């Protein structure tokens, strides 16, 4: 039988050089709270540090996933080929640009 693996939790927010001055309040279900408290205790962190770390790491991963654009090799090549060798503007594109120029006032 395999031994359970204990995950080491590092407080990733400790390296952020600014004071803790902002509050976050939220409600949750009793079972969720108990589970978080148990995991926090097993990790050697208090409830707040554990919850903040988990939320912060998830936020960073979510932002990174949304900021990254992954392309297959063929798509990558087509994308950069189009940038390097753009097609000549069509009549419809010229008309659209003209309407835009007449409608939008730049500051």
Curated annotation (Swiss-Prot):
Alphabetically ordered keywords of this record: Plasmid, Toxin-antitoxin system
Function: Probable antitoxin component of a type II toxin-antitoxin (TA) system. Should neutralize cognate toxin TacT (y4aS).
Subunit structure: Forms a complex with cognate antitoxin TacT.
Family per similarity comment: Belongs to the TacA antitoxin family.
Name of this chain's protein: Probable antitoxin TacA
GO BP terms, alphabetized: regulation of DNA-templated transcription
Keyword Nucleotide-binding recorded: no
InterPro entries linked: Ribbon_hlx_hlx, TacA_1-like
PANTHER family cross-referenced by the UniProt entry: ABC-TYPE TRANSPORT SYSTEM (PTHR35401:SF2), COPG FAMILY HELIX-TURN-HELIX PROTEIN-RELATED-RELATED (PTHR35401)
